[in-house]
């Protein structure tokens, strides 16, 4: 990630979305210069880089970097969090340590997003929380997306998707649902 930060700074890209990613191949606790066990580890690397400190702890010759960034949040709880209280605790840490905004994992039920934002505000999280809206465009996403992203699909939406005979029909239903989410 250090080389990516150098390149982004050189290119004038200063606003980042920091995501750990879904790497499942490394053992828990294993850390490399291209992978962090937690997004907060990546956050610390960017914060250090902004102060002119390299990943090995040494100072580097270039000027301090001006990166600002957002981080992920999960209206339906991160799959690795034992409960929502724990998830909110770490979310507060992300904001306390410099996250300028948050972007949610995709969701299909706006009520869950609204409840999540209300909970965040009650816990003192005041940065913008940008909703992650994604249309379903393939029939198989009805079963695949909930398994991969732990996002519930509301029954009225699932019922309409089950009626679809083709991916084109599923896409039309998915895009319409997404439009209605955005309008709401």
Please provide the spans of the model-predicted regions.
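Active-site pocket-lining/capping segments in soluble small-molecule metabolic enzymes
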Residues: 33-66, 70-80, 87, 122-177
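Short, ordered loop/turn segments at secondary-structure junctions
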Residues: 20-23, 74, 107, 134-135
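Flexible, glycine-rich active-site loops centered on histidine and acidic residues
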Residues: 2-44
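Catalytic beta/alpha-barrel core
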Residues: 17-19, 100-109, 174
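Catalytic cores of alpha/beta
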Residues: 1-9, 85-90, 115-121, 138-144
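Short, acidic/polar
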Residues: 1-5, 82-93, 174-183
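Short, surface-exposed connector motifs at secondary-structure boundaries
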Residues: 95-102, 124-125, 184
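Conserved, mostly hydrophobic/aromatic
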Residues: 8, 94, 98, 131
